[in-house]
């Protein structure tokens, strides 16, 4: 999930900012997003107060959070399966190996 900053009604639209930044009107909104270089993205975020930019999918904090959730859920699953079944089961061993890789 990507969070977007909510724009107040009095604040100018996204396109107005872009026109001021580039000095020209561009085409479709989706194409504009792809046309920005990484330097322009950083400048744009700083000058226009966008804390969550759309193209930034995986921040380190987000990746770490996802990784921790997977690891925890994986551990939980392993414990449950081991308690109710025999300890020396192949599935449990292979799961343990894959869990430690993450």
From Swiss-Prot:
GO CC annotations, alphabetized: nucleosome; nucleus
Tissue expression per record: Testis.
PTM characteristics: Proteolytic processing into mature chains is required for histone eviction during spermatogenesis. Transition proteins (TNP1 and TNP2) are required for processing.
GO BP, one annotated term: spermatid development
Basic residues bias spans: 49-102
UniProt-annotated stretches for the region Disordered: 1-102
Compartment(s) where it occurs, according to its Swiss-Prot or TrEMBL record: Nucleus; Chromosome
Cysteines joined through disulfide linkages: none
InterPro entries per record: PRM2
Residue positions, PTM Phosphoserine: 8, 10, 37
Pfam families reported in the protein's UniProt record: Protamine_P2 (PF00841)
GO terms of molecular function: DNA binding
Biased composition (Basic and acidic residues): 39-48
Record keyword Nucleus present: yes
Key words of the record: Chromosome, Developmental protein, Differentiation, DNA condensation, DNA-binding, Nucleosome core, Nucleus, Phosphoprotein, Spermatogenesis
Major place of residence: nucleus
Keyword Cell membrane: no
Family: Belongs to the protamine P2 family.
Protein function: Protamines substitute for histones in the chromatin of sperm during the haploid phase of spermatogenesis. They compact sperm DNA into a highly condensed, stable and inactive complex.
Subunit structure: Interacts with TDRP.
Name of this chain's protein: Protamine-2
Lineage per the UniProt record: Eukaryota, Metazoa, Chordata, Craniata, Vertebrata
């Amino acid at each position: 999930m990507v969070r977007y900053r909510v724009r107040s009604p009095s604040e100018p639209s996204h396109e107005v900012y872009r026109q001021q930044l580039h000095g020209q009107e561009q085409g479709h909104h989706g194409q504009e997003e792809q046309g920005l270089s990484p330097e322009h993205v950083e400048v744009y975020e700083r000058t226009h107060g966008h804390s969550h930019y759309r193209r930034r999918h995986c921040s380190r904090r987000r990746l770490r959070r996802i990784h921790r959730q997977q690891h925890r859920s994986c551990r939980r699953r392993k414990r449950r399966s081991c308690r109710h079944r025999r300890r020396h089961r192949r599935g449990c061993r292979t799961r343990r190996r894959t869990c430690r890789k993450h």
